Structures are given as C-alpha cells and as structure tokens.
Amino acid sequence: MLEVMVRHRLGDFALDANFASDGGLTALFGRSGSGKTSLINAIAGLIRPDHARIVVGDEVLTDTDRHIFVPRHRRRTAYIFQEGRLFPHLTVRQNLLYGRWFTRPLQRRGDFTQVVDMLGIGHLLRRRPALLSGGEKQRVAIGRALLASPRLLLMDEPLASLDEDRKAEILPYIERLRDETRLPIVYVSHSIAEVARLASTLVILSEGRIAAAGPAAEVMTRLDLSPITGRPETGAIIETRIVDHDAAFGLTRLRAAAGELRVPRLELPAGSKVRVRVRARDVMIAVREPTGLSALNVLPGVITEIGPSEGPIAELRLDCRGDALIARLTRQSIATLKLSNGRKVYAVIKSVAFDSRAVGRGSDMAKSADVEAVVAEDLFSGATRRDHQSADPAPAAD
C-alpha cells in the first residue's frame, strides 16, 4: 500500500497531490512541468514538503502534522534516473553489488543470481559501463537498485533517453519486475504508450494537481482527459488471455470480456495474459453487424458517452460487455448514423492495428503465464499504414 499526500510550493509552482495505490506499478503521467518529478522527489525524501503524509506499507516516511520526516538515506527507496548513472570504473558485477554493501545484512533481500537472470545480464558481469548499450545500462541500474533491498522502487522516466529499439528491449524486464518481485514501483513518464503497457494504477497530473487517479484501465477511458493525454494517443487497454495460435495465417486469438480478438502472432503460450491497447483512431463504428469485411475484429457494444467535439471530431465511449473502448469519429458520421447514448453498435478493429513489435520479446516473457504485454504501440507505420489505406472501407463506419 502506498499513500501519498503532498502540498508544496516551489517558487511560482504549487504542487497539491493526493492519491493511494494498492501496489504494483503506479504511473505518474503528465506533460513536462506538471509536477511529476517534484512529487517523486518528495516520496524519495529529496525535498521536504510544506505539508505532507507519505506512507509505504505500514511505515510512515513523512507526516508533517506529527513532525515525522525519515531522512532519504533511511527510507530504503531505490531511485532510477533517466541515465543509468553507473560507476564507470567498476564492472557490472561490482556496480550490482555496490548498493548491497550499504544494506544491513538483516534487511538484505533478493538473490544475486535470480536478479541477474530476471534482467538477462549474466553475460555482462565482467564488462564496464562504457561497453554497454543504453538499454543494458538501465537493466544494470535496475539490478543494482533491487539488490539494495528497497521497500519502494522509484523510476523517473527511465526510458526517456533510449531509442525505440532499446525501449522495446527493456520494457519486458520492467514487466517482469512488476509481476515477479511484488515490489511497489512508482514510475514517472510522459509517454502514454509506456503507461498503457506498464501501469496498474495511473495518476495523471496537470499543473501541479491530480486530474485523475485510479486503475489504469478506468482512467485511460475517461474522455475528459484527452487534452492532457493527447488526442492522437487516446485509447483503451483491455486485459485478455491467449486462446490459441493460427500457424497458417500467423495470428493469435485472444479472449476478453468484450469478445475475441485476432492479432499478429504473439510468441507467448496459450493461457498467457496479454494487455491490449486499442487507440480510439483505430476503432470504426457500425450500426449493423457488418459482413464481408477485411477487418477480423468486431465487438458488440453500447454507447455510454459522447464527448464534446473538437472541430469536426468527437469521441465515443463504448461498453463492450464490461470492457471499455473509445472511438474517434467525425461529427458528420455521428449525425449520419444517428449515434446517441444507449445505442447498440459494433466496434470494428483491424488486426493489423495491433503491432506485435510492442509485445514483450522471446522466452523472457513466455516463462510466466502471468506476464502482461501491450500490442498497438506504433499502429500505422510501414506496411501497416499501406495495408490500412488499401483495405476496403467498412460499410456504415467512419
């Protein structure tokens, strides 16, 4: 359990944040200057807030009303920055063990071999940081943090300095960290794609205040948050499970409360949990059950909300048997199809809208049936864009 209440003024900027999380990975999302780093620094004890109460588990780290402020070196919080900040004169092994030297023996948790195996860095132990890629440096930094036996892991935009390939390399390890260690994580990011993939709890900040906080799947589908999250990235996340694979066509069949989805083949075993991200711009709407489509995914649903228009565009929120989806349509399509709250419709999603490159790679993820992944990170690049443009249009859809 993580409980955070912070009120603090930094010059002209006022931070006023209050949220709670049951564990897992809590993502702090917002634009630059929204207060994310100030908030995580308050949790770490790097700043002393004007008024605050911060509790991790059963330990109070800060409570200004009771004059409690645990110094940062006694908080047992590990902090991972944008850059790995490894010691250049030490090997990877020595960097990993550095934090452990300063941890009391009775507080030490985590086995060296298990941490090394989980992060896939066994072959790097004799190297020095200068010979590591950006993704490798961050994996070593995560390992060093874990071996310091923290009660809380803080990650301040750890992927911001990495290119897309290195991000794809390290994301599965953060997923494993979230799922296998049971260590509460606070993760700062301004990337909605990272948040959609990783977050258990999502906290959205805007101008120093919390605009929304709660389970990630619920917060992601709030239409009023599009101006903060960015309309091109607006979408939903759906928890699914792999049913089977279609070797002949290179597809994987997923089952969710909303129905079945077919996506490009995932290298995960049947029964694995998969988190699917569906962007609003990739959802078409039909008022009758469509036939003769190239799109393989058709989900029945009911319109529960029509958001305010922005120029010619508006967004709809659908309830698909308990799963929420968002669709972005023109106001002309909404008028032509006579769409309104309570109207039964069909959401149409092309399989090629789910980019399998955003799924965790290889056996690292396949080892656990509880691994979650995200598809649909870069939906319309390369061949995917060409396929979308050349496909037959869906009848009665925007």
What are these regions (language model features)?
Residues L90, Q94-R109, M118:
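ABC-type ATPase nucleotide-binding domains, specifically the catalytic core motifs of the NBD
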Residues L147-R151:
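A short, proline-enriched helix->beta-strand linker immediately N-terminal to the Walker B motif
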Residues E260-G307, A324, R328-D398:
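Glycine/charge-rich catalytic "coupling/switch" loops of P-loop NTPases
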Residues E59-T64, Q107-L124, E175-R176:
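Conserved ABC ATPase "signature" region
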Residues D179, S189-G259:
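Internal alpha/beta loop-helix hairpins
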Residues L61-A78, F102-P105, R109:
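ABC ATPase NBD coupling module
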